[in-house]
Amino acid sequence: MPYVNIKVTDEGVTAEQKRQLIEGVTELLERVLNKPRYATSVVIDEVATDNWGVGGESVTTLRNKERNSGQR
């Protein structure tokens, strides 16, 4: 019984995008591992950017730097 946990920052992932992720991951496990759809669980966790760090800085800080420098 596969369990897949997808973590994304809480920056506006839509319900439709989540639906597509759940469907796509389920199809992938069915195709690659021959796992039945009914046995696959997919959980999407949205994490606040203050709670996600990359390279020693929070995503909030990184996004602010990107905005200030015109990147992204």
Q: Where are the regions that the model predicts?
A:
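A domain-level signal for the structural core that forms small-molecule/cofactor-binding pockets
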Residues: 2-72
